Amino acid sequence: MRPLAVHHVSINVADVDAALDFYTGVLGLEQRPDRPDFPMGGAWLDAGGQQVHLIEGTPPPGLGQHFALLVEDLDDTITELRREGIEVSDPRPVGRSRQAFVADPSGNAIELHEAGAA
């Protein structure tokens, strides 16, 4: 098997409207208009050409399940989010990269990832 790419990441959220406000209003993702008419609530988002699917359901606990958003400048991103009242972990090095975490309104962990020198 040779996958071409990751098509989407699906995340369970307790409140679709609150999650949609957070992901679009705070994290800057854009809502996609092409979500099929599924029986469960949800929304499709675009994150730099990658899809993030919000699905109404119970989110799992902990940091083990998360996805990462690549950011250009982690310090600027943390400052901007904290200025908006969003709780963000302090940055920490991971190899040549750096990361910090935020949580959406349902408690899902989102890694903010700044790539290091190759």
PLM segments and residue spans:
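N-terminal beta-strand motif that seeds the catalytic metal site of vicinal oxygen chelate
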Residues: 1-18, 65-67, 116-118
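Mid-chain, well-packed structural core segment of small domains
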Residues: 66-83
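Structural preference for long, well-ordered alpha-helical segments within the folded cores
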Residues: 21-22, 80, 106
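Core segments of cupin and vicinal oxygen chelate
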Residues: 10-50
